[in-house]
């Protein structure tokens, strides 16, 4: 029942927000972010995560407030994206790539080898998808099967309406990895979120000086198919969250950058570690835009989860 109520509230909020004028939606979502930044498990874990990035002494109330505003800006834009999407938005996104990144993506598309892009949960990663659809027709990604099913179906319908192709992480007759391999061998593009290991079967890496695990999917796909592999940095610019006081308060826009990752001659662990290093550089540049409110590092996991991952023995087991 709780899941159904949550789904109903989410879908209702989605429909209401999509019809609100942008200035009103912005005020409401920033108010919600400011309230949420003061308490709750999510903001508390966000503080711990940000402490790894900027140092505990630099996790100020202002940084946490801007981080929560950035997180809520993502959801506001997600709810309003169908009305925003179009040629004008795609052209603006085109202008907001860091010099050299567009050329890398175009060259990869023209190579016919396929393109894999791994992104952290930062900025608005859906905007990268809008750009890909405008330029290349579509791209493929994987989504966690949310509960209840009605929420997952709404999520899929929304993103497919934007031109995204969605593969469920679980429940498919053909494994997701095989489906994505087929896309890449046809010269297509796959985008995957890259820093949260949802399955517990990821690759151990060092991230901001501490141990965690990250998904191996993007690296495996590049190894198996010969596709070009990139990590992406996605950040907000303007608005109330910009790290630059000079830009803060200006028109809301975005910034995108891609970095190639070496695959040939590298082990899986080396590839995923390079991806983690790239993510770290991007997150350090815009820590307020990293929307990770869940535990990531091994040190923050619950005892039961650490035991499931084999990081420590269960009580009563021999040492």
Which residues fall in each region the model found?
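Membrane-anchoring hydrophobic helices of lipid-metabolizing enzymes
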Residues: 1-119, 152, 156, 163
């Amino acid at each position: 029942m709780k899941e159904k109520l949550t789904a109903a509230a989410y879908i209702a909020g989605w429909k209401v927000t999509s019809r609100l004028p942008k200035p009103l939606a912005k005020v409401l979502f920033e108010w919600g972010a400011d309230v949420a930044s003061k308490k709750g498990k999510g903001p508390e874990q966000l503080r711990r995560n940000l402490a790894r990035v900027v140092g505990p002494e630099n996790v100020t109330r202002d940084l946490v407030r801007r981080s929560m505003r950035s997180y809520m800006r993502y959801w506001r834009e997600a709810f309003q994206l169908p009305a925003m999407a179009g040629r004008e938005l795609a052209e603006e996104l085109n202008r907001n790539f860091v010099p050299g990144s567009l050329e890398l993506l175009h060259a990869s598309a023209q190579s016919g080898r396929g393109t894999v892009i791994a992104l952290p949960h930062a900025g608005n990663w859906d905007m990268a998808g809008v750009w890909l659809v405008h330029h290349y027709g579509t791209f493929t990604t994987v989504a966690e099967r949310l509960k209840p099913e009605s929420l997952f179906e709404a999520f899929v319908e929304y993103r497919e309406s934007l031109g995204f192709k969605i593969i469920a992480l679980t429940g498919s007759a053909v494994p997701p990895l095989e489906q994505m391999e087929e896309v890449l061998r046809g010269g297509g593009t796959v985008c995957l979120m890259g820093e949260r290991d949802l399955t517990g079967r990821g690759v151990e890496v060092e991230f901001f000086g501490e141990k965690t695990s990250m998904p191996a999917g993007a690296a495996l796909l590049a190894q198996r198919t010969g596709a070009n592999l990139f990590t992406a940095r996605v950040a907000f610019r303007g608005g109330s969250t910009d790290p630059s006081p000079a830009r803060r308060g200006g028109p809301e826009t975005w910034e995108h950058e891609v970095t190639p990752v070496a695959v040939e001659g590298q082990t899986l662990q080396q590839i995923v570690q390079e991806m983690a290093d790239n993510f770290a550089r991007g997150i350090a540049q815009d820590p307020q835009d990293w929307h990770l409110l869940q535990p990531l590092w091994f040190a923050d996991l619950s005892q039961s989860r650490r035991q499931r991952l084999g990081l420590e023995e269960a009580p009563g087991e021999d040492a």
